[in-house]
């Protein structure tokens, strides 16, 4: 029998000398700040690896997208089915300054709206705001019973659907093209839907009219001054205030 060192016995000891390092010791916390258009500014915290050498933490933070419930941002449970996307555009100290990046409905809300015996009408419009943001808005609406209607179903004819869709497109185009992205985020939750509902009463009564989705297609060249103004540097008095713009029907003086 040959006498020598058993190599297999020494291999297992090498792994015992390794010291495990907690990866969170190399990370820093940054605060995520929402624009002043929302009542609640503090969205939450995010983690990122600490700046080391040529790897800058700010570069990893810029471009991050956070999804937040609009009910939490506006302190209103009526908006609990709306989700707002916020994108980090700039990092100031330990604060991540965000801008509006999109809006969507929760899947359970969308599924609860779709029912039998009614017609679903959808429309989408691509429009440019006054501050050169290219956005696409998706609208959704459902027919409802007329007053004193006995018939169970509320199906609209194809011509009525086309007329309603045309009206929806015109209203969205007019509202979105005449305001900034900040103003649009205030109009989207309720104002545009109410105006569409009132404008289409003569064609077919509608219910559950909403802008279900806002998609940001293209942003203008980054402007730090505009972003800082959006986060409290401007001297506007409408910070975090709800928009209550009522739709006024046109009255014909002569027939």
From Swiss-Prot:
It comes from the Eukaryota. One of its GO terms (cellular component) is cytosolic small ribosomal subunit. One of its GO terms (molecular function) is structural constituent of ribosome. The modification N-acetylalanine is found at residue 2. InterPro entries: Ribosomal_eS1, Ribosomal_eS1_CS, Ribosomal_eS1_euk. Keywords: Acetylation, Cytoplasm, Ribonucleoprotein, Ribosomal protein. GO terms for biological process: translation. PROSITE patterns: RIBOSOMAL_S3AE (PS01191). PANTHER family: 40S RIBOSOMAL PROTEIN S3A. This is Small ribosomal subunit protein eS1. It comes from Arthroderma otae (strain ATCC MYA-4605 / CBS 113480). The gene is RPS1.
């Amino acid at each position: 029998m040959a006498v020598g060192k058993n190599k297999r016995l020494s291999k297992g000891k090498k792994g015992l000398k390794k010291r495990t390092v907690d990866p969170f010791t190399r990370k820093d916390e940054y605060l995520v700040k929402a624009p002043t258009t929302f009542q609640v500014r503090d969205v939450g915290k995010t983690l990122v690896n600490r700046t080391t050498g040529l790897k800058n933490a700010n570069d990893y933070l810029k471009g991050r997208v956070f999804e937040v419930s609009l009910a939490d941002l506006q302190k209103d449970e009526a908006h609990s089915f709306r989700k707002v996307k916020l994108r980090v555009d700039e990092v100031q100290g330990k604060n991540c300054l965000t801008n509006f990046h999109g809006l969507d409905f929760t899947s359970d809300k969308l599924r609860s709206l779709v029912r039998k015996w009614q017609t679903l009408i959808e429309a989408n419009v691509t429009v440019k705001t006054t501050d050169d943001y290219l956005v696409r808005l998706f609208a959704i609406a459902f027919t409802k019973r007329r007053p004193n209607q006995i018939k169970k179903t509320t199906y609209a004819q194809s011509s009525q659907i086309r007329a309603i869709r045309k009206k929806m497109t015109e209203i969205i185009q007019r509202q979105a093209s005449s305001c900034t992205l900040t103003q649009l985020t205030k109009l989207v939750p309720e104002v545009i839907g109410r105006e569409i509902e009132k404008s289409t009463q003569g064609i077919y009564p509608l219910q559950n009219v909403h802008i279900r989705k806002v998609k940001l297609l293209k942003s203008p060249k980054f402007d730090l001054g505009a972003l800082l103004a959006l986060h409290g540097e401007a001297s506007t008095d409408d910070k975090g205030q709800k928009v209550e713009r009522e739709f006024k029907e046109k009255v014909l003086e002569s027939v």
